[in-house]
Amino acid sequence: MKVTFQVPSITCNHCVDKIEKFVGEIEGVSFIDASVEKKSVVVEFDTPATQDLIKEALLDAGQEVV
């Protein structure tokens, strides 16, 4: 599954690195594309990963998800 999350709080490459670290730790995540310019994060994943787990990881990384 491929999902795009709108994350308006992404402001720099440090944010991107932190997002990639937190979301990348979730089993089942196969691709992450966090964009400062688009203020979005595209994630491809399979079970056991879920949208809720990814959203929680984004929040744990200090980001706001809308």
Swiss-Prot record:
Keyword list, A-Z: Copper, Metal-binding
Gene name as annotated: copP
Annotated Cu cation binding sites: 12, 15
Domain named HMA: residues: 1-66
Function statement: Part of a cation-transporting system which is associated with copper export out of the H.pylori cells.
Native species: Helicobacter pylori (strain J99 / ATCC 700824) (Campylobacter pylori J99)
GO molecular function, one term: copper ion binding
Gene Ontology biological process terms from the UniProt entry: copper ion transport
InterPro entries named among the record's database cross-references: Cu-bd (IPR000428), Heavy-metal-associated_CS (IPR017969), HMA_Cu_ion-bd (IPR006122), HMA_dom (IPR006121), HMA_dom_sf (IPR036163)
Protein name: COP-associated protein
Superkingdom assignment: Bacteria
